[in-house]
Amino acid sequence: MNTSAPPAVSPNITVLAPGKGPWQVAFIGITTGLLSLATVTGNLLVLISFKVNTELKTVNNYFLLSLACADLIIGTFSMNLYTTYLLMGHWALGTLACDLWLALDYVASNASVMNLLLISFDRYFSVTRPLSYRAKRTPRRAALMIGLAWLVSFVLWAPAILFWQYLVGERTVLAGQCYIQFLSQPIITFGTAMAAFYLPVTVMCTLYWRIYRETENRARELAALQGSETPGKGGGSSSSSERSQPGAEGSPETPPGRCCRCCRPPRLLQAYSWKEDEEEDEGSMESLTSSEGEEPGSEVVIKMPMVDPEAQAPTKQPPRSSPNTVKRPTKKGRDRAGKGQKPRGKEQLAKRKTFSLVKEKKAARTLSAILLAFILTWTPYNIMVLVSTFCKDCVPETLWELGYWLCYVNSTINPMCYALCNKAFRDTFRLLLLCRWDKRRWRKIPKRPGSVHRTPSRQC
């Protein structure tokens, strides 16, 4: 929404001339009604999607959820009451309803701006301070920041709108009109426009520019890293030495030809796995290493002992068993494999950086769409606010009405931005609209399963 309503700048304006024809009234009513319906439907889809699809329950999407709540309030109350105001040509619902509408409208509008600032700062710190910031980036902290954004918006607008007339001792709002009393002076309206629109937009654009520059720098670093890799070396090779660990002291090794009578099931060893999580914008590598700290690229293969059934009975003699053969890198093996490990480490680092870059670009794309929609829909009205400060009669009444409504349209566009830039939102919207949401298991499945190596058992 906007920072000030048209009557706040020109209190003596008749909102809609009573002489409007029935076709004009019908056109305005149908158009605004459809916009209100689209706004409510779109933002309800966002809320329901967040509820049913656990893949969307991420820290970044908590801010989008808060923004959708503000847009839902605007679509449900602000749009419809303003349409009534336009069609009737005067405010007929009383002074209390007027003040409550204005308070709700301005609190929700300011909360939208605050949420956009939170999204911008969240993306900025995630890109520029990935280690320190993401350690503190939890759902609880996100909820706290969202709560503060709404609290600040409420404190700034609601008390002043509701109680200003009691502070000054009289109500100066003209009969049949609805606007904020303390914004009747153009200079005050100009100040609120600067603080509530131009300053936040400047901060958002600056942060987005910094995010763009940082993302481009990372893309160049990734290209340089990938270009320095040597193909065909160190893809999965590891040099290791085998050490025999007897099952008991003094027991000889099992002859090569001996067959086990009891075979263990195959063991699964995970060398590394990708974690893809919308909440974290980077993939993380996990390595299975020995207790002595092998490098992530090394592979540990444990062969379980094959114990004879007869040897399991209690006896004074130590049981005979096949040796525990542990295949693990040694210092000597590492020295020989040093050249092969480096390319593998670079390959894993390149994969991690690629995944991080993809996530950052996707989040930046969503942010850019939201910011672009916000700037395009809010700028015309706020330009008219500046013009009216120096020339009261230079802005036609029709432009005021269009500019005011265009601010509302931003709440209609935001859910479309989520769907266009986020495949998870888009797929969930489609399933909900087709009434097929119950046919899908809303459970997050890792998109990059870990690479699992199977150690085969001995064949009898």
Swiss-Prot record:
Keywords: Cell membrane, Disulfide bond, G-protein coupled receptor, Glycoprotein, Membrane, Phosphoprotein, Postsynaptic cell membrane, Receptor, Synapse, Transducer, Transmembrane, Transmembrane helix. It is a multi-pass membrane protein. It comes from the Eukaryota. Residues 328-343 have a biased composition (Basic residues). The modification Phosphothreonine is found at T230, T428, T455. Residues 238-247 have a biased composition (Low complexity). The modification Phosphoserine is found at S451, S457. PROSITE patterns: G_PROTEIN_RECEP_F1_1, G_PROTEIN_RECEP_F1_2. GO terms for cellular component: GABA-ergic synapse; glutamatergic synapse; plasma membrane; postsynaptic membrane. Residues 1-22, 85-95, 165-185, 391-401 are extracellular. One of its GO terms (biological process) is positive regulation of MAPK cascade. It is found in: Cell membrane; Postsynaptic cell membrane. Residues 225-259, 273-297, 310-351 are annotated as: Disordered. InterPro entries: GPCR_Rhodpsn, GPCR_Rhodpsn_7TM, Musac_Ach_M1_rcpt, Musac_Ach_rcpt. Glycans are attached at N2, N12. Belongs to the G-protein coupled receptor 1 family. Muscarinic acetylcholine receptor subfamily. CHRM1 sub-subfamily. Interacts with GPRASP2. Interacts with TMEM147. PANTHER family: 5-HYDROXYTRYPTAMINE RECEPTOR, MUSCARINIC ACETYLCHOLINE RECEPTOR M1. This is Muscarinic acetylcholine receptor M1. It comes from Macaca mulatta (Rhesus macaque). The lineage of its organism: Eukaryota, Metazoa, Chordata, Craniata, Vertebrata.
